[in-house]
Amino acid sequence: MIVFLPQSQTAIISNLLGPLFPHFPNLNTLRGDRYRFVEPYLETVQKLRDLQVHVIIPGRHLPIQGAELIDGCLARLHGAVDYVHRETLAGMNAGIDVHTLMNDIVLPSELRVGQGYGKVAWGVRTIWETYMGWFHLQSSTELYAAQPIEAMGELVQLIGVDVACERAESLVSTDQPVLAVHIAEAILLVEPNHERAAAVMVAAHQALLAQGGDVSFWESGWLRHQIIKWSR
């Protein structure tokens, strides 16, 4: 909801566009929430532009002042979200899987906005799942309750936890911390008290923070929590 005060061209928007302005929206929060649809969001941003506001009073932080500044921010925000929406749909229609799209879709420099709240990659995934649902069309296993980590655990037992842990450590050292986490989690499924695997979890999450995971406060909070959890 927008409360508009025409005498001063002021819009009171609370957290309508998120707590950080102008940052990419969180179309689905890490804390758990219903998916937020792109089209109503874009309509809201355009409505604010049409009002030609001079002051925005958000739900957090100080008021934002200046008609030219506000319109420029809103224009860029609208363009950024619209771009990600269109690029995601184009990728879906081309048969590209969601994880590839999450990796490949980036904002052009002229549409760059902050990602301290929502992230482009998360927006891509939410848009994909809003249209397609939870079935990613990649594997029959998606239709059943068995988790991928269970299969990874079987492979860890087959090759041995020490060999698997060496590979995970190598992945951390070669800047592939996400893959290292996958393997370390499988090891810990087989041997919950495996100290080297726990150390890999700490190192991998530290690496993710260093690689930009500290930009989004949602992501940095989760990564730091995991570091504390696995520090033994």
Question: Model-found features: residue ranges?
Answer:
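Metallo-beta-lactamase
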Residues: 1-94
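C-terminal regulatory/interaction regions
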Residues: 90-232
